[in-house]
A protein has these predicted regions:
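N-terminal signal peptide c-region/cleavage motif recognized by signal peptidases
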Residues: 4-6
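Auxiliary, metal-adjacent structural segments of Zn-dependent hydrolase domains
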Residues: 10-11, 53-116, 125
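Soluble periplasmic/extracytoplasmic beta-strand elements of cell-envelope proteins
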Residues: 23-25, 82-85, 121
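Short pre-active-site segment immediately N-terminal to the catalytic Zn-binding motif
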Residues: 114-133, 144-149
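Post-HExxH zinc-binding segment in Zn-dependent metallohydrolases
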Residues: 148-167
Length: 167
């Protein structure tokens, strides 16, 4: 029996962009523009100004998901997750503390994936294509296997994605 993780469309967020694989949840247009710019492979003369279009964020996310799936050779048929785009790392710290319910002992990651909620948490302060691809790898891995592999194994695979993303 395969259980799908429920993904709710941006509960509590004021704005969202839907893509083939994700709901991008954000609070303001400027934050989404920074997110879109941050996840681009490189600045291109031809894409200048496109980061102002919400659909551009969706296109870039879907391209990253497809690249990650190819690298891992994992194509989950029911892949669907949320991406919560926060304004700064303090917001990530607060979300991490709330979700882990353990408090924070040590360093909070710059971004993280919660299998329980099917959500990637990122901040526009620290976003890059590599960081997002790493977290997308966790989502792909968790959706691919009926029982997600241990965290250390997932981390090895996600680091593989980091290393080979642009090859």
């Amino acid at each position: 029996m395969v259980l799908s993780v429920p993904v709710y469309a941006c509960d509590g967020w004021s704005k969202s962009v839907g893509t083939k694989y994700a709901n991008i949840c954000y609070s303001n247009d400027r934050g989404l523009q920074r997110f879109t710019r941050g996840i681009g492979k490189e600045s291109s003369f031809f894409s200048k100004g496109l980061e102002k279009e919400p659909a551009e964020a969706g296109k870039k996310v879907d391209l990253l998901v497809e690249r990650v799936s190819r690298l891992l050779d994992m194509y989950p048929f029911d892949l669907r997750f949320n991406i919560y785009v926060y304004q700064n790392h303090r917001d990530i710290e607060n979300a991490y503390t709330r979700i882990t319910a353990l408090g924070v002992f040590g360093r909070v990651p710059v971004a993280f994936y919660s299998h329980k909620s099917g959500t990637i948490y990122v901040s526009v302060e620290n976003i890059s294509a590599g960081i997002l691809a790493h977290e997308i790898a966790h989502a792909v891995i968790n959706f691919y296997f009926p029982e997600p592999p241990p965290e250390r194994m997932q981390e090895i695979l996600a680091q593989y994605v980091d290393k080979h993303l642009w090859e």
